[in-house]
Protein backbone atom coordinates (compact mmCIF):
# COMPACT_ATOMS: atom_id res chain seq x y z
CA UNK A 1 0.00 0.00 0.00
CA UNK A 2 1.40 3.41 -0.94
CA UNK A 3 1.97 6.04 1.76
CA UNK A 4 -0.93 8.12 0.40
CA UNK A 5 -3.31 5.12 0.43
CA UNK A 6 -2.20 4.19 3.94
CA UNK A 7 -2.68 7.72 5.33
CA UNK A 8 -6.04 8.09 3.55
CA UNK A 9 -7.27 4.82 5.07
CA UNK A 10 -6.54 6.18 8.58
CA UNK A 11 -8.67 9.31 8.08
CA UNK A 12 -12.24 9.72 9.32
CA UNK A 13 -13.72 13.05 8.25
CA UNK A 14 -17.22 13.81 9.48
CA UNK A 15 -19.66 16.54 10.51
CA UNK A 16 -22.12 16.71 13.35
CA UNK A 17 -25.64 17.79 12.40
CA UNK A 18 -28.61 18.57 14.63
CA UNK A 19 -31.46 20.90 15.47
CA UNK A 20 -30.33 23.87 17.64
CA UNK A 21 -29.96 22.91 21.32
CA UNK A 22 -29.90 19.15 20.79
CA UNK A 23 -26.45 19.23 22.41
CA UNK A 24 -24.27 19.15 19.34
CA UNK A 25 -21.53 21.51 20.55
CA UNK A 26 -21.40 19.72 23.93
CA UNK A 27 -21.01 16.39 22.17
CA UNK A 28 -18.27 17.88 19.97
CA UNK A 29 -16.43 18.85 23.15
CA UNK A 30 -16.77 15.39 24.61
CA UNK A 31 -15.50 13.70 21.46
CA UNK A 32 -12.44 15.97 21.67
CA UNK A 33 -12.08 15.09 25.33
CA UNK A 34 -12.15 11.34 24.63
CA UNK A 35 -9.83 11.85 21.68
CA UNK A 36 -7.35 13.47 24.08
CA UNK A 37 -7.45 16.76 22.17
CA UNK A 38 -8.54 18.74 25.23
CA UNK A 39 -8.09 17.97 28.92
CA UNK A 40 -11.26 19.56 30.23
CA UNK A 41 -14.51 20.16 28.40
CA UNK A 42 -16.04 23.64 28.60
CA UNK A 43 -19.71 23.26 29.37
CA UNK A 44 -21.72 25.16 26.84
CA UNK A 45 -24.47 26.11 29.28
CA UNK A 46 -22.19 27.83 31.81
CA UNK A 47 -21.88 30.82 29.51
CA UNK A 48 -20.85 33.24 32.24
CA UNK A 49 -18.21 30.87 33.51
CA UNK A 50 -14.67 31.01 32.22
CA UNK A 51 -15.04 27.78 30.28
CA UNK A 52 -16.37 28.43 26.82
CA UNK A 53 -16.81 25.52 24.48
CA UNK A 54 -13.67 25.03 22.42
CA UNK A 55 -15.53 24.87 19.15
CA UNK A 56 -17.63 28.06 19.58
CA UNK A 57 -14.73 30.42 19.09
CA UNK A 58 -16.04 33.60 17.52
CA UNK A 59 -16.86 36.36 20.04
CA UNK A 60 -20.51 36.43 19.01
CA UNK A 61 -20.88 32.68 19.47
CA UNK A 62 -19.39 32.90 22.95
CA UNK A 63 -21.85 35.67 23.80
CA UNK A 64 -24.96 33.97 22.43
CA UNK A 65 -24.14 30.32 23.01
CA UNK A 66 -25.00 29.18 19.49
CA UNK A 67 -22.57 27.91 16.88
CA UNK A 68 -22.56 30.39 14.02
CA UNK A 69 -19.60 29.25 11.93
CA UNK A 70 -18.41 25.73 11.38
CA UNK A 71 -15.17 24.93 13.11
CA UNK A 72 -12.70 22.30 12.04
CA UNK A 73 -10.92 20.15 14.59
CA UNK A 74 -8.48 17.30 14.22
CA UNK A 75 -7.54 14.72 16.84
CA UNK A 76 -5.92 11.27 16.86
CA UNK A 77 -7.93 8.33 18.23
CA UNK A 78 -6.40 4.87 18.49
CA UNK A 79 -4.54 4.46 15.18
CA UNK A 80 -6.87 6.80 13.26
CA UNK A 81 -6.91 10.55 12.62
CA UNK A 82 -10.35 12.08 13.11
CA UNK A 83 -11.30 15.34 11.38
CA UNK A 84 -14.42 16.75 12.97
CA UNK A 85 -16.29 19.59 11.28
CA UNK A 86 -18.72 21.31 13.63
CA UNK A 87 -21.65 22.96 11.86
CA UNK A 88 -24.00 25.75 12.93
CA UNK A 89 -27.25 24.28 14.21
CA UNK A 90 -29.10 27.56 13.73
CA UNK A 91 -31.41 27.52 10.71
CA UNK A 92 -30.16 30.83 9.31
CA UNK A 93 -26.74 29.32 8.67
CA UNK A 94 -27.90 26.42 6.55
CA UNK A 95 -25.70 27.28 3.57
CA UNK A 96 -22.54 27.03 5.62
CA UNK A 97 -23.72 23.64 6.88
CA UNK A 98 -24.64 22.52 3.35
CA UNK A 99 -21.15 23.28 2.10
CA UNK A 100 -19.52 21.59 5.08
CA UNK A 101 -21.50 18.45 4.22
CA UNK A 102 -19.85 18.46 0.78
CA UNK A 103 -16.46 18.17 2.50
CA UNK A 104 -17.10 15.15 4.75
CA UNK A 105 -17.30 11.39 4.23
CA UNK A 106 -19.96 10.73 6.89
CA UNK A 107 -22.12 12.53 9.45
CA UNK A 108 -23.26 12.14 13.04
CA UNK A 109 -26.84 13.18 13.76
CA UNK A 110 -27.65 14.32 17.30
CA UNK A 111 -31.25 14.02 18.51
CA UNK A 112 -32.67 15.31 21.81
CA UNK A 113 -34.35 12.38 23.61
CA UNK A 114 -37.22 14.62 24.76
CA UNK A 115 -37.90 16.32 21.43
CA UNK A 116 -37.19 13.59 18.90
CA UNK A 117 -36.82 14.47 15.22
CA UNK A 118 -37.07 18.25 14.75
CA UNK A 119 -37.55 20.37 11.65
CA UNK A 120 -33.89 21.35 11.20
CA UNK A 121 -32.84 17.69 11.49
CA UNK A 122 -35.22 16.86 8.63
CA UNK A 123 -33.69 19.57 6.39
CA UNK A 124 -30.11 18.49 7.11
CA UNK A 125 -31.04 14.89 6.52
CA UNK A 126 -32.36 15.83 3.06
CA UNK A 127 -28.94 17.30 2.25
CA UNK A 128 -27.18 14.12 3.40
CA UNK A 129 -29.64 12.15 1.28
CA UNK A 130 -28.61 13.97 -1.90
CA UNK A 131 -25.10 12.62 -1.42
CA UNK A 132 -25.97 9.28 0.25
CA UNK A 133 -23.81 10.34 3.18
CA UNK A 134 -23.48 7.55 5.80
CA UNK A 135 -25.03 8.68 9.10
CA UNK A 136 -24.69 7.54 12.70
CA UNK A 137 -27.23 8.74 15.28
CA UNK A 138 -26.63 9.77 18.90
CA UNK A 139 -29.77 10.18 21.00
CA UNK A 140 -28.67 12.71 23.59
CA UNK A 141 -29.73 14.03 27.02
CA UNK A 142 -30.56 10.58 28.37
CA UNK A 143 -30.04 12.03 31.87
CA UNK A 144 -33.41 13.80 31.39
CA UNK A 145 -36.86 12.33 30.91
CA UNK A 146 -37.73 11.85 27.25
CA UNK A 147 -39.64 9.81 24.71
CA UNK A 148 -39.72 6.03 24.83
CA UNK A 149 -36.60 4.70 23.01
CA UNK A 150 -38.62 2.34 20.78
CA UNK A 151 -40.90 5.26 19.85
CA UNK A 152 -37.83 7.33 18.97
CA UNK A 153 -36.47 4.67 16.61
CA UNK A 154 -39.86 4.47 14.98
CA UNK A 155 -39.94 8.26 14.59
CA UNK A 156 -36.49 8.35 12.95
CA UNK A 157 -37.50 5.58 10.54
CA UNK A 158 -40.86 7.14 9.63
CA UNK A 159 -39.94 10.84 9.49
CA UNK A 160 -36.41 10.56 8.09
CA UNK A 161 -36.99 7.46 6.00
CA UNK A 162 -33.86 5.65 7.14
CA UNK A 163 -33.58 2.23 8.77
CA UNK A 164 -32.39 2.24 12.42
CA UNK A 165 -29.98 -0.31 13.87
CA UNK A 166 -29.59 0.26 17.64
CA UNK A 167 -26.03 -0.41 18.83
CA UNK A 168 -26.45 0.70 22.44
CA UNK A 169 -29.69 0.57 24.43
CA UNK A 170 -30.59 2.66 27.50
CA UNK A 171 -31.24 1.19 30.94
CA UNK A 172 -33.79 3.70 32.24
CA UNK A 173 -33.58 7.46 31.67
CA UNK A 174 -33.72 10.72 33.62
CA UNK A 175 -33.59 10.06 37.38
CA UNK A 176 -33.70 6.30 36.77
CA UNK A 177 -30.83 6.18 34.26
CA UNK A 178 -28.53 3.30 35.16
CA UNK A 179 -26.49 2.82 31.99
CA UNK A 180 -26.55 1.39 28.48
CA UNK A 181 -26.20 -2.11 27.05
CA UNK A 182 -23.98 -2.55 24.00
CA UNK A 183 -26.10 -4.79 21.79
CA UNK A 184 -23.19 -6.06 19.68
CA UNK A 185 -20.76 -6.92 22.50
CA UNK A 186 -23.34 -7.55 25.25
CA UNK A 187 -21.41 -5.30 27.66
CA UNK A 188 -23.23 -3.15 30.20
CA UNK A 189 -21.80 0.36 30.75
CA UNK A 190 -22.98 1.84 34.05
CA UNK A 191 -23.92 5.50 34.37
CA UNK A 192 -22.14 7.40 37.14
CA UNK A 193 -23.28 11.03 37.21
CA UNK A 194 -21.32 14.03 38.39
CA UNK A 195 -18.02 13.34 36.60
CA UNK A 196 -18.85 15.36 33.57
CA UNK A 197 -15.83 17.58 32.93
CA UNK A 198 -13.03 15.06 32.67
CA UNK A 199 -12.71 11.82 30.82
CA UNK A 200 -14.25 9.00 32.79
CA UNK A 201 -14.05 5.29 32.33
CA UNK A 202 -17.41 3.88 33.32
CA UNK A 203 -17.78 0.60 35.18
CA UNK A 204 -18.37 -2.13 32.61
CA UNK A 205 -20.01 -5.51 33.20
CA UNK A 206 -19.27 -8.15 30.52
CA UNK A 207 -22.98 -9.04 30.08
CA UNK A 208 -26.45 -8.68 31.61
CA UNK A 209 -25.90 -12.08 33.28
CA UNK A 210 -22.74 -10.90 35.09
CA UNK A 211 -22.79 -11.40 38.87
CA UNK A 212 -23.23 -8.16 40.79
CA UNK A 213 -25.22 -6.34 38.10
CA UNK A 214 -28.57 -6.88 39.84
CA UNK A 215 -27.23 -5.21 43.01
CA UNK A 216 -26.06 -2.22 40.96
CA UNK A 217 -29.23 -1.55 38.98
CA UNK A 218 -31.91 -3.41 40.98
CA UNK A 219 -33.46 -6.82 40.31
CA UNK A 220 -36.72 -5.40 38.94
CA UNK A 221 -34.92 -3.12 36.49
CA UNK A 222 -32.77 -6.01 35.30
CA UNK A 223 -35.88 -8.15 34.71
CA UNK A 224 -37.53 -5.29 32.77
CA UNK A 225 -34.32 -4.83 30.77
CA UNK A 226 -34.28 -8.50 29.72
CA UNK A 227 -37.86 -8.19 28.41
CA UNK A 228 -37.09 -4.95 26.61
CA UNK A 229 -33.94 -6.32 24.96
CA UNK A 230 -35.86 -9.33 23.69
CA UNK A 231 -38.44 -7.00 22.17
CA UNK A 232 -35.84 -4.64 20.66
CA UNK A 233 -33.71 -7.37 19.15
CA UNK A 234 -36.80 -8.99 17.66
CA UNK A 235 -38.25 -5.77 16.23
CA UNK A 236 -35.20 -3.81 15.06
CA UNK A 237 -32.71 -4.25 12.25
CA UNK A 238 -29.28 -5.74 12.94
CA UNK A 239 -26.33 -3.50 12.01
CA UNK A 240 -25.40 -3.92 8.34
CA UNK A 241 -22.13 -2.25 7.32
CA UNK A 242 -23.01 -2.07 3.63
CA UNK A 243 -26.43 -0.51 4.26
CA UNK A 244 -24.82 2.06 6.61
CA UNK A 245 -22.09 2.95 4.09
CA UNK A 246 -24.74 3.38 1.37
CA UNK A 247 -26.68 5.84 3.55
CA UNK A 248 -29.63 3.46 3.96
CA UNK A 249 -29.22 2.51 7.63
CA UNK A 250 -28.18 4.50 10.69
CA UNK A 251 -26.54 2.84 13.72
CA UNK A 252 -28.12 4.38 16.86
CA UNK A 253 -26.41 5.16 20.19
CA UNK A 254 -27.91 6.50 23.41
CA UNK A 255 -26.11 8.67 25.95
CA UNK A 256 -25.68 11.99 27.70
CA UNK A 257 -23.07 14.24 26.11
CA UNK A 258 -22.96 16.63 29.05
CA UNK A 259 -22.14 13.73 31.41
CA UNK A 260 -19.63 12.10 29.03
CA UNK A 261 -21.85 9.09 29.02
CA UNK A 262 -22.25 6.79 26.02
CA UNK A 263 -19.70 8.82 24.04
CA UNK A 264 -16.86 6.30 24.15
CA UNK A 265 -18.81 3.37 22.59
CA UNK A 266 -19.92 5.79 19.84
CA UNK A 267 -16.37 6.94 19.11
CA UNK A 268 -14.96 3.39 19.15
CA UNK A 269 -17.65 2.22 16.73
CA UNK A 270 -17.24 5.30 14.55
CA UNK A 271 -13.49 4.92 13.96
CA UNK A 272 -13.94 1.24 13.20
CA UNK A 273 -16.88 1.47 10.76
CA UNK A 274 -17.15 5.01 9.32
CA UNK A 275 -15.77 5.31 5.78
CA UNK A 276 -12.31 6.65 5.05
CA UNK A 277 -12.03 9.24 2.20
CA UNK A 278 -13.87 8.21 -0.97
CA UNK A 279 -13.42 9.02 -4.67
CA UNK A 280 -14.91 12.38 -5.71
CA UNK A 281 -16.40 13.71 -8.94
CA UNK A 282 -14.85 16.54 -10.92
CA UNK A 283 -15.72 18.16 -14.25
CA UNK A 284 -13.24 15.86 -15.98
CA UNK A 285 -13.17 12.54 -14.13
CA UNK A 286 -13.44 10.85 -10.76
CA UNK A 287 -10.45 11.36 -8.46
CA UNK A 288 -9.48 8.57 -6.05
CA UNK A 289 -7.90 9.52 -2.69
CA UNK A 290 -4.86 7.27 -3.18
CA UNK A 291 -3.69 9.11 -6.32
CA UNK A 292 -0.23 10.60 -5.81
CA UNK A 293 -0.96 14.13 -6.97
CA UNK A 294 -2.56 16.63 -4.64
CA UNK A 295 -6.12 17.80 -5.31
CA UNK A 296 -8.48 19.65 -3.00
CA UNK A 297 -11.37 22.11 -2.95
CA UNK A 298 -12.33 25.10 -0.81
CA UNK A 299 -15.66 24.68 1.00
CA UNK A 300 -15.56 27.62 3.39
CA UNK A 301 -13.88 30.98 3.88
CA UNK A 302 -13.64 32.58 7.30
CA UNK A 303 -12.70 36.22 7.77
CA UNK A 304 -10.84 37.37 10.87
CA UNK A 305 -10.11 34.11 12.62
CA UNK A 306 -7.42 36.07 14.37
CA UNK A 307 -8.67 39.60 15.16
CA UNK A 308 -5.07 40.74 15.66
CA UNK A 309 -4.24 39.92 12.05
CA UNK A 310 -7.32 40.89 9.93
CA UNK A 311 -6.85 37.65 8.07
CA UNK A 312 -8.98 35.45 5.87
CA UNK A 313 -8.55 31.73 5.81
CA UNK A 314 -9.86 29.42 3.08
CA UNK A 315 -10.66 25.92 4.35
CA UNK A 316 -9.56 23.31 1.83
CA UNK A 317 -10.49 19.63 1.96
CA UNK A 318 -7.63 17.49 0.63
CA UNK A 319 -9.12 14.90 -1.77
CA UNK A 320 -6.03 13.09 -3.05
CA UNK A 321 -2.25 13.02 -2.78
CA UNK A 322 -0.06 14.64 -0.17
CA UNK A 323 0.11 18.30 0.75
CA UNK A 324 3.49 19.50 1.99
CA UNK A 325 4.33 22.93 3.38
CA UNK A 326 5.23 25.54 0.77
CA UNK A 327 4.35 23.38 -2.24
CA UNK A 328 3.31 24.99 -5.52
CA UNK A 329 -0.21 24.27 -6.72
CA UNK A 330 -2.37 25.14 -9.70
CA UNK A 331 -5.36 27.36 -8.83
CA UNK A 332 -7.76 26.05 -11.48
CA UNK A 333 -10.26 28.95 -11.62
CA UNK A 334 -7.61 31.62 -12.19
CA UNK A 335 -5.24 29.38 -14.15
CA UNK A 336 -2.36 30.63 -11.98
CA UNK A 337 0.27 28.90 -9.93
CA UNK A 338 -0.10 29.45 -6.19
CA UNK A 339 2.38 28.62 -3.47
CA UNK A 340 0.67 27.29 -0.34
CA UNK A 341 2.93 28.70 2.33
CA UNK A 342 2.02 28.67 6.04
CA UNK A 343 -1.07 26.49 5.63
CA UNK A 344 -2.79 25.74 8.93
CA UNK A 345 -4.29 22.78 10.74
CA UNK A 346 -6.97 23.43 13.33
CA UNK A 347 -8.01 22.63 16.82
CA UNK A 348 -10.99 25.05 16.78
CA UNK A 349 -9.19 28.42 16.74
CA UNK A 350 -5.84 27.07 17.92
CA UNK A 351 -3.89 26.85 14.73
CA UNK A 352 -0.66 25.13 13.92
CA UNK A 353 1.34 25.41 10.72
CA UNK A 354 0.69 22.26 8.69
CA UNK A 355 3.84 20.42 7.67
CA UNK A 356 1.80 17.94 5.66
CA UNK A 357 -1.78 16.83 5.08
CA UNK A 358 -3.39 13.78 3.52
CA UNK A 359 -6.74 12.91 1.89
CA UNK A 360 -9.59 13.70 4.29
CA UNK A 361 -7.64 16.41 6.12
CA UNK A 362 -8.70 20.05 6.11
CA UNK A 363 -6.08 22.77 5.87
CA UNK A 364 -6.40 26.52 6.08
CA UNK A 365 -4.88 28.68 3.36
CA UNK A 366 -4.22 32.37 3.98
CA UNK A 367 -6.16 34.34 1.48
CA UNK A 368 -6.10 37.97 0.39
CA UNK A 369 -9.25 37.88 -1.68
CA UNK A 370 -7.95 35.60 -4.44
CA UNK A 371 -9.67 32.39 -3.31
CA UNK A 372 -13.43 31.73 -3.55
CA UNK A 373 -15.69 29.03 -2.15
CA UNK A 374 -15.66 26.06 -4.54
CA UNK A 375 -12.14 26.72 -5.89
CA UNK A 376 -10.12 23.63 -6.81
CA UNK A 377 -6.36 23.26 -6.34
CA UNK A 378 -4.35 20.61 -8.21
CA UNK A 379 -0.76 19.96 -9.25
CA UNK A 380 -1.53 21.12 -12.80
CA UNK A 381 -4.64 19.26 -13.95
CA UNK A 382 -7.50 21.54 -15.06
CA UNK A 383 -10.43 19.85 -13.31
CA UNK A 384 -12.97 21.30 -10.87
CA UNK A 385 -14.73 19.44 -8.05
CA UNK A 386 -18.48 19.64 -8.51
CA UNK A 387 -21.46 20.12 -6.23
CA UNK A 388 -20.55 23.09 -4.00
CA UNK A 389 -23.41 25.56 -4.39
CA UNK A 390 -24.17 29.19 -3.58
CA UNK A 391 -27.88 29.72 -2.93
CA UNK A 392 -29.93 32.78 -3.84
CA UNK A 393 -30.70 34.67 -0.61
CA UNK A 394 -34.29 35.01 0.56
CA UNK A 395 -33.96 38.22 2.59
CA UNK A 396 -32.41 41.53 1.55
CA UNK A 397 -31.39 44.67 3.45
CA UNK A 398 -29.67 47.90 2.51
CA UNK A 399 -26.63 48.86 4.61
CA UNK A 400 -26.90 52.30 6.21
CA UNK A 401 -23.72 53.90 7.63
CA UNK A 402 -23.61 55.98 10.82
CA UNK A 403 -20.39 57.65 9.66
CA UNK A 404 -20.30 58.33 5.88
CA UNK A 405 -16.49 58.64 5.99
CA UNK A 406 -16.23 54.92 6.69
CA UNK A 407 -17.70 53.86 3.34
CA UNK A 408 -14.45 52.16 2.26
CA UNK A 409 -14.30 50.06 5.44
CA UNK A 410 -17.98 49.14 5.05
CA UNK A 411 -17.48 47.99 1.45
CA UNK A 412 -14.42 45.99 2.43
CA UNK A 413 -16.17 44.46 5.46
CA UNK A 414 -19.28 43.45 3.51
CA UNK A 415 -17.21 42.00 0.67
CA UNK A 416 -15.01 39.99 3.05
CA UNK A 417 -17.92 38.72 5.13
CA UNK A 418 -19.77 37.68 1.97
CA UNK A 419 -16.75 35.62 0.92
CA UNK A 420 -17.62 33.29 3.79
CA UNK A 421 -20.86 32.49 1.98
CA UNK A 422 -23.41 33.01 4.79
CA UNK A 423 -24.32 36.47 3.46
CA UNK A 424 -24.08 37.81 -0.08
CA UNK A 425 -23.17 41.34 -1.06
CA UNK A 426 -24.70 43.07 -4.10
CA UNK A 427 -23.86 46.40 -5.75
CA UNK A 428 -26.67 47.67 -8.01
CA UNK A 429 -25.50 48.90 -11.44
CA UNK A 430 -27.44 52.18 -11.22
CA UNK A 431 -27.21 53.25 -7.56
CA UNK A 432 -24.70 53.49 -4.74
CA UNK A 433 -26.70 51.24 -2.44
CA UNK A 434 -24.89 48.38 -0.73
CA UNK A 435 -27.32 45.47 -0.46
CA UNK A 436 -26.81 42.42 1.70
CA UNK A 437 -28.71 39.19 1.06
CA UNK A 438 -29.09 36.30 3.50
CA UNK A 439 -31.18 33.20 4.12
CA UNK A 440 -32.15 34.22 7.67
CA UNK A 441 -32.63 37.33 9.83
CA UNK A 442 -29.96 36.33 12.34
CA UNK A 443 -27.30 36.80 9.67
CA UNK A 444 -27.95 40.56 9.54
CA UNK A 445 -27.39 40.78 13.31
CA UNK A 446 -24.20 38.80 12.91
CA UNK A 447 -23.04 41.05 10.03
CA UNK A 448 -23.73 44.25 12.03
CA UNK A 449 -21.97 42.82 15.08
CA UNK A 450 -18.93 41.68 13.12
CA UNK A 451 -18.66 44.93 11.11
CA UNK A 452 -18.45 46.82 14.40
CA UNK A 453 -16.26 44.30 16.20
CA UNK A 454 -13.84 43.45 13.39
CA UNK A 455 -13.89 46.47 11.05
CA UNK A 456 -14.81 49.32 13.41
CA UNK A 457 -17.85 50.26 11.29
CA UNK A 458 -21.26 51.01 12.77
CA UNK A 459 -23.94 50.11 10.24
CA UNK A 460 -27.62 49.28 10.38
CA UNK A 461 -29.59 47.24 7.88
CA UNK A 462 -32.91 48.58 6.62
CA UNK A 463 -35.56 47.02 4.38
CA UNK A 464 -35.12 47.33 0.63
CA UNK A 465 -37.59 46.51 -2.16
CA UNK A 466 -35.99 43.26 -3.27
CA UNK A 467 -37.83 39.95 -2.87
CA UNK A 468 -35.57 37.49 -4.60
CA UNK A 469 -32.37 37.25 -6.66
CA UNK A 470 -31.28 35.18 -9.65
CA UNK A 471 -27.88 34.83 -11.30
CA UNK A 472 -28.10 35.77 -14.95
CA UNK A 473 -26.27 33.97 -17.80
CA UNK A 474 -26.49 34.20 -21.57
CA UNK A 475 -24.18 32.63 -24.13
CA UNK A 476 -25.05 35.35 -26.67
CA UNK A 477 -23.05 38.49 -25.74
CA UNK A 478 -25.26 40.82 -27.81
CA UNK A 479 -28.48 39.57 -26.18
CA UNK A 480 -26.91 39.87 -22.73
CA UNK A 481 -25.93 43.48 -23.46
CA UNK A 482 -29.50 44.27 -24.59
CA UNK A 483 -30.83 42.64 -21.42
CA UNK A 484 -28.44 44.74 -19.32
CA UNK A 485 -29.59 47.97 -20.95
CA UNK A 486 -33.30 47.20 -20.59
CA UNK A 487 -33.08 45.94 -17.00
CA UNK A 488 -30.27 48.06 -15.57
CA UNK A 489 -32.45 49.26 -12.68
CA UNK A 490 -32.85 45.69 -11.41
CA UNK A 491 -29.32 44.44 -12.04
CA UNK A 492 -26.42 44.24 -9.61
CA UNK A 493 -23.00 42.60 -9.34
CA UNK A 494 -22.26 40.14 -6.56
CA UNK A 495 -18.96 40.16 -4.64
CA UNK A 496 -17.36 37.94 -7.30
CA UNK A 497 -18.48 40.26 -10.13
CA UNK A 498 -21.28 38.02 -11.45
CA UNK A 499 -24.42 39.62 -12.86
CA UNK A 500 -27.50 39.22 -10.65
CA UNK A 501 -31.14 40.18 -11.23
CA UNK A 502 -32.70 41.64 -8.06
CA UNK A 503 -36.48 41.26 -8.40
CA UNK A 504 -38.82 43.53 -6.40
CA UNK A 505 -41.61 40.92 -6.67
CA UNK A 506 -42.03 37.34 -7.87
CA UNK A 507 -44.30 38.62 -10.65
CA UNK A 508 -41.58 41.00 -11.82
CA UNK A 509 -39.12 38.09 -11.99
CA UNK A 510 -41.61 36.01 -13.97
CA UNK A 511 -42.15 38.83 -16.48
CA UNK A 512 -38.40 39.38 -16.88
CA UNK A 513 -37.93 35.67 -17.58
CA UNK A 514 -40.76 35.64 -20.13
CA UNK A 515 -39.44 38.74 -21.92
CA UNK A 516 -35.89 37.37 -22.19
CA UNK A 517 -36.18 33.69 -23.14
CA UNK A 518 -32.49 33.53 -24.18
CA UNK A 519 -31.30 34.57 -20.74
CA UNK A 520 -30.86 31.90 -18.05
CA UNK A 521 -31.95 32.84 -14.51
CA UNK A 522 -30.59 30.52 -11.84
CA UNK A 523 -31.36 30.28 -8.11
CA UNK A 524 -28.03 28.67 -7.30
CA UNK A 525 -24.59 29.27 -8.61
CA UNK A 526 -22.06 26.45 -8.54
CA UNK A 527 -19.43 28.08 -6.36
CA UNK A 528 -16.56 27.69 -8.82
CA UNK A 529 -18.17 27.23 -12.18
CA UNK A 530 -15.51 28.89 -14.28
CA UNK A 531 -12.43 26.94 -15.21
CA UNK A 532 -9.33 28.47 -16.75
CA UNK A 533 -7.18 26.07 -18.64
CA UNK A 534 -3.56 26.99 -17.95
Curated annotation (Swiss-Prot):
Question: So which residues are the signal peptide here?
Answer: none
Q: Tell me the GO BP annotations in alphabetical order.
A: regulation of translational termination
Q: What is its main location?
A: cytoplasm
Q: Which domain of life is it from?
A: Bacteria
Q: Name the keywords, alphabetized.
A: Cytoplasm, GTP-binding, Nucleotide-binding, Protein biosynthesis
* Record-level GO cellular component terms: cytosol
A Gene Ontology molecular function term for this protein is:
guanosine tetraphosphate binding
Instruction: Domain (tr-type G): give its ranges.
Output: 9-278
Q: Which residues bind GTP?
A: 18-25, 86-90, 140-143
InterPro entries (UniProt xref): EF-G-like_DII (IPR053905), EFG_III/V (IPR035647), G_TR_CS (IPR031157), P-loop_NTPase (IPR027417), PrfC (IPR004548), RF3_C (IPR032090), RF3_dom_3_sf (IPR038467), RF3_GTP-bd (IPR041732)
Compartment annotation = Cytoplasm
What family does the entry list? Belongs to the TRAFAC class translation factor GTPase superfamily. Classic translation factor GTPase family. PrfC subfamily.
What function does the entry list? Answer: Increases the formation of ribosomal termination complexes and stimulates activities of RF-1 and RF-2. It binds guanine nucleotides and has strong preference for UGA stop codons. It may interact directly with the ribosome. The stimulation of RF-1 and RF-2 is significantly reduced by GTP and GDP, but not by GMP.
In Swiss-Prot or TrEMBL terms, this protein is called Peptide chain release factor 3
Q: Which organism is it from?
A: Stenotrophomonas maltophilia (strain K279a)
Q: Show the taxonomic lineage.
A: Bacteria, Pseudomonadati, Pseudomonadota, Gammaproteobacteria, Lysobacterales
Q: Which gene encodes it?
A: prfC
